Amino acid sequence: TELSVTLVPKKRKYMEVENDMNTVRTKTKYKLGLALSGGGARGFAHLGVIKAMNEYGIRPDIISGTSAGALVGAMIAAGKTPEECIEFFHHTKVLQFARFTMSKMGLMSMCGMEEKLKKFLGVKTFDELPIPLVVTASDINNSISVHFNAGELIPCVLASCSIPVIFIPVEINGIIYVDGGLFMNLPVRPIRDICEKVIAVEINSIDSHEKVSNMIHMAERSFHLGLAANTRIDKKLSDIFISPENMIKYGMFDLNHIEEIFEIGYKKAKEVLKDFNKVIHTPIVIAN
């Protein structure tokens, strides 16, 4: 049985994580939850999906995100529009996000991303977010998924995005965390029992015959294969499943095709969500 915990202050209203099911328990029930998967730069497709949702008048009552999904989820939960998020990435160079380091724990540090996010989001804690957010990270020492929903926001988001070997892990309260996708790349389970319906967006397409050309590519490829393997349960638990096609050609750090990736997510969501009002009242899964 996979155990799971949440790190939150004791003397405050908070959500608890049920150890045997990876679900968040709360007296609050939400009509619609949105689960966003990890996938590196492919996460720009999440923003396209959310733009389509906005055009259809579909607003999530709670967001659950892993890795890139946690980053996008934090931005949207903070009240930013998809367009504002795209502008944020356009005006920030890669080396402002991640910097090479000599650390034995990872090739790059995300200290630059931390400062940029603080300024852009305009909030410091989960409680300040207009939309409730759950961020999934991996406790690498105890081999468990951890679902954050209170306390400081940005350290949790960075922990969720810390791809092993590539990025230096994030330490929170003495515990070392890495990318949430390691154990749960499509975080439907944390919000499944507290939402009437859940839309899940999975952006981690895999080419079964992809060639590996260098060390970074090998690490990226290996990680993506692991992500694909752990999404099956959560996919089945969603009510509407959106998986944009043609994502394979975009690498984890591809910031040169932001609009293309965004548009792929937007078009797929427009197609899948056109019958949202009919679909949301039936227990079926829409796949790509």
Label every model-predicted segment:
Residues L7-T66, A74-N288:
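Patatin-like phospholipase
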